[in-house]
Amino acid sequence: MPALLLLVLLASSAGQARARPSNATSAEPAGPLPALLAHLRRLTGALTGGGGAASPGANGTRTGPAGGAGAAARAPPPAELCHGYYDVMGQYDATFNCSTGSYRFCCGTCHYRFCCEHRHMRLAQASCSNYDTPRWATTPPPLAGGAGGAGGAGGGPGPGQAGWLEGGRTGGAGGRGGEGPGGSTAYVVCGVISFALAVGVGAKVAFSKASRAPRAHRDINVPRALVDILRHQAGPGTRPDRARSSSLTPGIGGPDSMPPRTPKNLYNTVKTPNLDWRALPPPSPSLHYSTLSCSRSFHNLSHLPPSYEAAVKSELNRYSSLKRLAEKDLDEAYLKRRPLELPRGTLPLHALRRPGTGGGYRMEAWGGPEELGLAPAPNPRRVMSQEHLLGDGGRSRYEFTLPRARLVSQEHLLLSSPEALRQSREHLLSPPRSPALPPDPTARASLAASHSNLLLGPGGPPTPLRGLPPPSSLHAHHHHALHGSPQPAWMSDAGGGGGTLARRPPFQRQGTLEQLQFIPGHHLPQHLRTASKNEVTV
């Protein structure tokens, strides 16, 4: 009731005030009633939660003093700052300011904060302890001087939080490091792997080169071992004989009658295609031995071409034995040399009978061993073939020759024994083709000349023996002797004494003289000095 009375009083006083003219001004001071009314309005506004200002007059020139106080009472509260903190995942949430609309208060929990509009839901941030990095987190402490601790536009850190709240957020989100050391580790690992690969490749290349060198030495040791065996079998005192026997056809009149053949390297299995033996100048006799010894020396194998190893591998079957090498060398020698003397180790195909002696024979018709060139060698050499060395002996497959002294004694035995002479003739000629003995000395000379031409080979013109006149039918005997014709010289001479054999049809020629050595079973008498203990006659 008292309040209603007061309101009535106030309304009446306000009506009286409005009844006054607006432009009138009172000079007298105001009474105590308006002051009392103003005090009452303030009290009622405080009790009701805010009172409105007095409504303006009609012309809007007056405003009640209570209007300013109501506007100040309705102003929004200041914005609150939520400080940065570490959440439950160990991640740092930066500081933010609650200044949007009516959301002026920092609410929530210590590990999850947000802005709200209710004052009673405010969070006491000073009571939280998650402003530092947790112990279980692996992130290093952030560097000082970061900008993460800067506050919002309208606020700052609370009282007592300037140091420990800003220090908790230094470096911002870049505080979680580790990228630098991880990148350098990757580079180091890649470098180590590359270095290991390079070392492995280099080691493999070096090992392959080291293993290839012993293999080449093993390949070349086989022919070198064979050369070493031949040099040891030849002996230290056989070099003069080797030098003499290397020239297959020395001249009869002397060493200057014919230039010696160019010495051939017997150990070189690869022929040089651009060299010809006819274009080479003949060496002097003084340099013959030195050239031969150097070409056949065991230590002069450095002249072999680079393809020596490949030639040894591809030609291993062809040059596997000394017998094949001897055949090849002897074929070339028969094609290139001139027939100047009888080969060693051969006997005439027909023996001579002294007329009227009844089987007795003499050496005077043939001449002495010195005239026939059958003088014994000072140091004969013999070389066993490779098949004989590596096999079971095999003596039945070869025909071994004898020294010259023993050949002369064997010739004496054949001339003194008719039975041995008959067996020798049966061995050299087929039984139905064995001719009769020559009747006179003229026929003996003709027969000896024909045998000389037979044994000398097809290299040049026929040359008679020393001390014997050349016969008239020398070419015919040479042809028949080479092609196996059994008709001797005295069978074509009707005036010869002692009787003749019945005539046989001449042998039909199957090939030329050069093709004879390539026909199977028609090889010429061949003999090779091979510097071994057992000479091989092919």
From Swiss-Prot:
GO terms for molecular function: GABA receptor binding. Residues 20-186 are extracellular. It is a single-pass type I membrane protein. GO terms for biological process: gamma-aminobutyric acid receptor clustering; gamma-aminobutyric acid signaling pathway; memory; positive regulation of long-term synaptic potentiation; regulation of GABA-A receptor activity. It comes from the Eukaryota. The modification Phosphothreonine is found at residue 512. Residues 145-178 have a biased composition (Gly residues). Residues 432-441, 459-472 have a biased composition (Pro residues). The chain crosses the membrane at residues 187-207. One of its GO terms (cellular component) is postsynaptic membrane. Glycans are attached at residues 23, 59. Residues 49-73, 139-178, 233-262, 423-505 are annotated as: Disordered. Its main location: membrane. The keyword Glycoprotein applies. Keywords: Cell membrane, Glycoprotein, Membrane, Phosphoprotein, Postsynaptic cell membrane, Signal, Synapse, Transmembrane, Transmembrane helix. The keyword rRNA processing does not apply. Residues 208-538 are cytoplasmic. A motif (PDZ-binding) lies at residues 535-538. Transmembrane protein that regulates gamma-aminobutyric acid type A receptor (GABA(A)R) trafficking, channel deactivation kinetics and pharmacology, necessary for fast inhibitory transmission in the brain. Enhances the action of benzodiazepine, a primary GABA(A)Rs target drug, in the brain. May affect channel kinetics of AMPA-type glutamate receptors (AMPAR), the brain's main excitatory neurotransmitter, necessary for synaptic hippocampal plasticity, and memory recall. May regulate the induction and maintenance of long-term potentiation at Schaffer collaterals/CA3-CA1 excitatory synapses. Interacts with GABA(A)R (GABA type A receptor) subunits GABRA1, GABRA2 and GABRG2; the interaction is direct. Does not interact with GABRB2 and GABRB3 subunits. May interact with AMPAR subunits GRIA1, GRIA2 and GRIA3 and AMPAR auxiliary proteins SHISA6 and SHISA7. May interact (via PDZ-binding motif) with DLG4/PSD-95 (via PDZ domain); the interaction is direct. PANTHER family: PROTEIN SHISA-7 (PTHR31774:SF2), PROTEIN SHISA-9-RELATED (PTHR31774). The PDZ-binding motif interacts with PDZ-domain of scaffolding protein DLG4. This is Protein shisa-7. It comes from Homo sapiens. The gene is SHISA7.
